[in-house]
Protein backbone atom coordinates (compact mmCIF):
# COMPACT_ATOMS: atom_id res chain seq x y z
CA UNK A 1 0.00 0.00 0.00
CA UNK A 2 1.05 3.58 -0.58
CA UNK A 3 -0.16 7.13 -0.20
CA UNK A 4 -2.73 7.98 -2.86
CA UNK A 5 -4.24 11.39 -3.48
CA UNK A 6 -7.76 10.14 -4.15
CA UNK A 7 -8.99 13.05 -6.28
CA UNK A 8 -6.06 12.77 -8.69
CA UNK A 9 -6.32 8.99 -8.69
CA UNK A 10 -10.01 9.05 -9.63
CA UNK A 11 -9.38 11.66 -12.35
CA UNK A 12 -6.74 9.40 -13.87
CA UNK A 13 -8.95 6.34 -13.52
CA UNK A 14 -11.82 8.05 -15.36
CA UNK A 15 -9.51 9.26 -18.15
CA UNK A 16 -8.11 5.74 -18.56
CA UNK A 17 -11.49 3.98 -18.51
CA UNK A 18 -13.96 6.40 -20.08
CA UNK A 19 -13.74 4.89 -23.59
CA UNK A 20 -13.96 1.31 -22.33
CA UNK A 21 -17.17 1.98 -20.43
CA UNK A 22 -18.58 4.11 -23.25
CA UNK A 23 -18.21 1.08 -25.52
CA UNK A 24 -20.31 -0.84 -22.97
CA UNK A 25 -23.00 1.87 -22.94
CA UNK A 26 -21.95 3.53 -19.69
CA UNK A 27 -21.16 7.25 -19.58
CA UNK A 28 -18.55 7.78 -16.88
CA UNK A 29 -17.78 11.11 -15.21
CA UNK A 30 -16.25 12.43 -12.00
CA UNK A 31 -16.92 15.29 -9.58
CA UNK A 32 -13.98 15.97 -7.35
CA UNK A 33 -14.44 18.64 -4.70
CA UNK A 34 -11.29 17.99 -2.67
CA UNK A 35 -7.63 18.73 -3.00
CA UNK A 36 -4.94 16.71 -1.25
CA UNK A 37 -7.30 14.10 0.19
CA UNK A 38 -4.71 11.43 0.83
CA UNK A 39 -5.43 7.82 1.73
CA UNK A 40 -3.27 4.74 2.21
CA UNK A 41 -4.22 2.07 -0.32
CA UNK A 42 -2.94 -0.29 -2.95
CA UNK A 43 -3.57 1.33 -6.36
CA UNK A 44 -4.15 -1.99 -8.16
CA UNK A 45 -6.70 -3.13 -5.59
CA UNK A 46 -8.39 0.26 -5.64
CA UNK A 47 -8.67 0.02 -9.42
CA UNK A 48 -10.22 -3.42 -9.01
CA UNK A 49 -12.83 -2.02 -6.61
CA UNK A 50 -13.83 0.76 -9.02
CA UNK A 51 -13.90 -1.57 -12.03
CA UNK A 52 -16.01 -4.06 -10.10
CA UNK A 53 -18.60 -1.39 -9.22
CA UNK A 54 -18.69 0.08 -12.74
CA UNK A 55 -18.91 -3.34 -14.39
CA UNK A 56 -22.10 -3.91 -12.40
CA UNK A 57 -23.44 -0.50 -13.44
CA UNK A 58 -22.75 -1.34 -17.09
CA UNK A 59 -24.32 -4.79 -16.72
CA UNK A 60 -27.54 -3.63 -15.04
CA UNK A 61 -28.20 -0.32 -16.79
CA UNK A 62 -31.88 0.35 -17.53
CA UNK A 63 -31.48 2.15 -20.85
CA UNK A 64 -29.15 1.88 -23.84
CA UNK A 65 -26.94 4.43 -22.15
CA UNK A 66 -26.39 4.34 -18.40
CA UNK A 67 -24.56 6.95 -16.33
CA UNK A 68 -22.12 6.57 -13.47
CA UNK A 69 -20.56 9.42 -11.53
CA UNK A 70 -17.64 9.10 -9.15
CA UNK A 71 -17.59 11.79 -6.46
CA UNK A 72 -14.64 12.35 -4.15
CA UNK A 73 -15.45 14.25 -0.94
CA UNK A 74 -14.11 14.44 2.59
CA UNK A 75 -14.90 15.38 6.16
CA UNK A 76 -12.57 15.85 9.14
CA UNK A 77 -11.60 12.21 9.46
CA UNK A 78 -12.50 10.42 6.24
CA UNK A 79 -12.23 10.61 2.48
CA UNK A 80 -15.16 9.28 0.47
CA UNK A 81 -15.28 7.88 -3.03
CA UNK A 82 -18.95 7.68 -3.99
CA UNK A 83 -20.01 5.85 -7.14
CA UNK A 84 -23.61 6.52 -8.20
CA UNK A 85 -25.47 5.10 -11.18
CA UNK A 86 -28.92 5.50 -12.69
CA UNK A 87 -29.67 1.80 -12.95
CA UNK A 88 -32.49 -0.10 -11.27
CA UNK A 89 -31.05 0.00 -7.76
CA UNK A 90 -31.60 -2.94 -5.45
CA UNK A 91 -34.69 -4.05 -3.51
CA UNK A 92 -34.33 -2.72 0.06
CA UNK A 93 -34.53 -6.21 1.54
CA UNK A 94 -31.51 -7.21 -0.55
CA UNK A 95 -29.24 -4.31 0.42
CA UNK A 96 -27.89 -5.97 3.57
CA UNK A 97 -27.26 -9.23 1.74
CA UNK A 98 -25.36 -7.70 -1.17
CA UNK A 99 -22.01 -8.11 0.54
CA UNK A 100 -22.29 -11.88 0.79
CA UNK A 101 -20.08 -13.84 -1.58
CA UNK A 102 -21.94 -14.77 -4.77
CA UNK A 103 -25.23 -13.22 -3.64
CA UNK A 104 -27.48 -12.26 -6.53
CA UNK A 105 -30.50 -10.03 -6.18
CA UNK A 106 -32.69 -12.12 -8.44
CA UNK A 107 -32.28 -14.36 -11.40
CA UNK A 108 -33.99 -11.98 -13.81
CA UNK A 109 -31.31 -9.35 -13.22
CA UNK A 110 -28.49 -11.64 -14.15
CA UNK A 111 -27.30 -13.37 -17.20
CA UNK A 112 -25.58 -16.71 -16.51
CA UNK A 113 -22.62 -15.68 -18.66
CA UNK A 114 -22.03 -12.61 -16.54
CA UNK A 115 -20.14 -14.18 -13.66
CA UNK A 116 -21.20 -14.90 -10.12
CA UNK A 117 -23.08 -12.35 -8.09
CA UNK A 118 -22.28 -8.67 -7.78
CA UNK A 119 -18.74 -9.21 -6.57
CA UNK A 120 -19.40 -6.81 -3.72
CA UNK A 121 -17.93 -9.18 -1.17
CA UNK A 122 -14.58 -8.65 -2.94
CA UNK A 123 -15.04 -4.90 -2.56
CA UNK A 124 -15.78 -5.28 1.13
CA UNK A 125 -12.69 -7.45 1.60
CA UNK A 126 -10.45 -4.98 -0.20
CA UNK A 127 -11.89 -2.04 1.73
CA UNK A 128 -11.17 -4.00 4.91
CA UNK A 129 -7.52 -4.20 3.86
CA UNK A 130 -7.59 -0.40 3.47
CA UNK A 131 -9.21 -0.09 6.95
CA UNK A 132 -12.19 1.46 5.24
CA UNK A 133 -15.80 0.48 4.84
CA UNK A 134 -18.50 0.22 2.20
CA UNK A 135 -22.04 1.60 2.45
CA UNK A 136 -24.62 0.82 -0.23
CA UNK A 137 -27.92 2.56 -0.69
CA UNK A 138 -30.54 3.30 -3.31
CA UNK A 139 -31.01 6.69 -4.93
CA UNK A 140 -34.38 8.13 -5.92
CA UNK A 141 -36.00 7.87 -8.40
CA UNK A 142 -33.73 4.94 -9.21
CA UNK A 143 -30.08 4.04 -9.03
CA UNK A 144 -27.50 2.60 -6.70
CA UNK A 145 -24.92 4.50 -4.67
CA UNK A 146 -21.83 2.80 -3.30
CA UNK A 147 -19.86 4.80 -0.75
CA UNK A 148 -16.24 3.82 -0.17
CA UNK A 149 -15.09 5.35 3.10
CA UNK A 150 -11.35 5.65 3.74
CA UNK A 151 -9.63 6.88 6.89
CA UNK A 152 -7.82 10.09 6.07
CA UNK A 153 -4.05 9.99 6.04
CA UNK A 154 -3.09 13.06 8.01
CA UNK A 155 -1.21 14.49 10.95
CA UNK A 156 -3.98 13.58 13.40
CA UNK A 157 -4.23 9.97 12.29
CA UNK A 158 -0.68 8.71 12.35
Residue ranges and their predicted role:
Residues 38-41:
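Conserved micro-motifs of the catalytic ATP-binding
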Residues 57-61:
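Short helix-loop "hinge" at the ATP-lid/N-box region of the Bergerat-fold HATPase_c
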Residues 85:
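Acidic ATP/Mg2+-coordinating residue in the GHKL
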Amino acid sequence: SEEIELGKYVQGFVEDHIEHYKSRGLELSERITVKNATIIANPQLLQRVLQNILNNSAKYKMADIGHSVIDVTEDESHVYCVVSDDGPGVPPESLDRLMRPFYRVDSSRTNPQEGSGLGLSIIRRIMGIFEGRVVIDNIRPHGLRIILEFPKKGENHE
